[in-house]
Amino acid sequence: AFDLNDFNTLEDTYDQMNVFQLSEAGLTHEGRDMKSWIDSLTHCRSHLDEDVFMFKRNEPDSGSACVGTDLNRSSNNPCSDTYGGSGPASALETRHSYSQQYEDELNQRQRYEPSGTTVNNLLNKDAGSIYSYTPELR
């Protein structure tokens, strides 16, 4: 049986994961299944900066006169400020949001900024941002 306070076998872990809708991403070099799920109900940590207002993304919703999807919300009403989209990961941004990269409209390829550069300082220290990482699975 799966126990959060103990080391669990791979089989027990996979059995516990069956409560989720799983996707298979292929095989490891050992021939084991790589299983994953999308956790789309993680709270957005809006308390980190009370001066920032999060706007809905500005893409028109098909079949509706309303515009916008809030990637961190789950309303089914397309005209609501908390409309979460037509389904899980329906917005392209949710498929990219796993990473710790800065991207602007000029990026044509993946690029990393070395520590101490203006961009790195702006995004971290100079902006006074708090680094937050939310996976809570043990």
Curated annotation (Swiss-Prot):
InterPro entries (alphabetical): Peptidase_M14 (IPR000834)
Pfam family, one: Peptidase_M14
Subcellular location, principal: secreted
GO biological process: proteolysis
Tissue spec: Detected in the body but not in the tentacle crown (at protein level).
Annotated EC: 3.4.17.-
The UniProt record lists the keyword Hydrolase: yes
pH dependence: Optimum pH is 7.0-7.5 with AAFP as substrate.
UniProt keyword list: Carboxypeptidase, Disulfide bond, Hydrolase, Metal-binding, Metalloprotease, Protease, Secreted, Zinc
Compartments it resides in: Secreted
Binding-site residues, Zn(2+): 43, 96
Cofactor(s) it depends on: Zn(2+)
Purpose of the protein: Carboxypeptidase that catalyzes the release of hydrophobic and acidic C-terminal amino acids.
Protein name: Carboxypeptidase
